[in-house]
Design a protein with these regions (language model features):
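Aliphatic-rich helical/repeat scaffold segments used for oligomerization and domain docking
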Residues: 1-233
């Protein structure tokens, strides 16, 4: 019931120092002084590309510790997400604890629940999976679906911790972690059979063309720059 749902503990995102501390403790088995200053700086740069949740940081640490691969190779695995990396991560989780749900499983379950909430949310999920994951303008979604639907959609994305808001921006925008977006696109491509159903993308293209025309008519350099960054993707 609703009382039970509202009582569930929500684990927020970790700060970079928290991510670093967790990663180093796992990699060095508690002896964080085992890393040199240069190695620590390299870890920081690596962790900037890892979703800021304990599960993601833990899996990254255990995976690199067991397989002895480079940071670049691991990030490539995340970007080229497939069933093999999914199985490998699940095996690692089984070895280190009783929890076996990987990031892919968590995100796809969240996507399923979001799509079940409203008939238009499936279209909006696909829509935001096709652009640059950073600084997506709210107006871009408003040009595709009704504003009330978009507001509700954003609420659901935030509810499942799939997005972050850029409070410092002068325009209402939000961002998705790149690996989260990659997982979403992989899942939606398979679920919607996009390889064969190319017509599914036609409304997206039509909406994008309209938004482009409207944007170019507005005297906002920032808005135009944002739009160009998404077109380049």
């Amino acid at each position: 019931n609703n009382k039970f749902v509202n009582s569930i503990l929500s684990i927020g995102e970790l700060s970079l120092p928290q991510k670093l501390s967790l990663y180093l403790k796992i990699m060095s088995k508690g002896n964080i002084n085992a890393f040199t200053l240069q190695q620590t700086e390299e870890v920081k740069k690596f962790l900037e590309n890892i979703p800021s949740f304990p599960l993601d940081v833990s899996i990254a640490a255990y995976y690199l510790n067991i397989n002895n691969i480079t940071y670049g190779q691991y990030l490539k695995y995340l970007n080229d997400y497939n069933q093999e990396i999914e199985n490998a991560q699940e095996d690692i989780l089984k070895e280190v604890g009783d929890y076996t749900k990987t990031r892919y499983q968590i995100i796809t379950l969240s996507l399923q629940q979001i799509m079940a909430s409203h008939k238009d949310f499936k279209d909006l999920l696909l829509f935001i999976s096709l652009f640059d994951s950073q600084n997506i303008p709210r107006d871009l979604l408003n040009s595709y679906k009704d504003k009330i639907i978009v507001d509700n959609f954003i609420h659901h994305l935030k509810k499942y911790s799939l997005i972050t808001h850029e409070l410092s921006s002068s325009l209402p925008v939000f961002s998705i972690h790149r690996s989260t977006q990659a997982i979403a696109l992989t899942y939606l491509t398979k679920t919607l059979n996009l390889e064969k159903n190319k017509k599914t993308l036609e409304p997206v293209i039509s909406s994008l063309e309209k938004y482009m025309a409207d944007t170019l008519e507005k005297p906002s350099i920032l808005l135009i720059k944002l739009f160009v960054s998404h077109c380049e993707v």
